[in-house]
Amino acid sequence: QMCIRDRSILYIYYGIKDGSIKDFTPTTFIFGAKSAPGYRRAKAIIKLIGEISKLVNADPDTKDLIKVVFVQNYNVSYAEKLVTAADVSEQISTAGTEASGTGNMKLMLNGAVTLGTYDGANVEIVQEAGEENNYIFGARVEELAEIMPKYDPREILFSNDKIKRVLDKLIDGSLSDGGVPSNEEGSFKELYKALTDGASWHVPDHYYVLGDLESYVQAKLKVNADYKDKLAFAKKCWLNIANAGKFSSDRTIKDYAENIWKIEPVKL
């Protein structure tokens, strides 16, 4: 779901530019990822993040408000620094597509609030630390089951001018892919068409990017506004740390031993 994140940054960038987003707290957006050599779409998304970085980091109107950083070859050594420093943990898989993960738990334990969908271990995080101490957005699994069979992303594209502006930047020459195969004429056309027309292996906007985008941006802006009250935000962080005990490996092993393996502890 990196593609919804890069589009949200463009949405905010152009909102700052046109004055519709005001009093924005300076924010650094950090991406860390890898792609298999032949995974063209992933390569194109990484290239797009680089182009967005060049755009917003150099613009005198936004360079003191937004920074975009892509960490190449993200690994444990980088994670040791970033996880401990992060204020916000973005866990933004489309609801129902993430089995679970541990990255969000590590960030929670280090005091980051979660900005994410109601998916994977995010569900347990908000159950433990409280939804009021985190930021949940987007359609839930049961809602998507009703939405997706009749979902037409073009309806959103042509009814929301701000989302259309963001998507148009992929094909109007504002951002160039620099020659990534299948994107045609130096644009990010394949990324655009994946959302509007689909591809050989999926329907249009298979991951409900456009459907969740407005909700995601509004959640992001709420985090941004809440961060101004440092004491209240710190309280959210501390409550996340204090309620991270469920994710202890000791608790997990004890539960497995009692409920799955049916074994008793042995004193050594």
Residue ranges and their predicted role:
Residues 2-4:
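Short, small-residue-biased leader/transition segments that mark boundaries at the very start
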Residues 8-21:
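Histidine-anchored nucleotide/phosphate-binding helix
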Residues 8-11, 32, 40-47, 71, ...:
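A terminal-accessory region detector
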Residues 25-33, 85-88:
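Glycine-rich, often proline-containing surface loops adjacent to acidic residues and nearby aromatics
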Residues 30-44, 48-80:
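Catalytic cores of eukaryotic secretory-pathway lumenal/extracellular enzymes that build
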Residues 84-85, 92-237, 241-246, 251, ...:
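Catalytic binding pocket for nucleotide-activated donors in carbohydrate/polymer assembly enzymes
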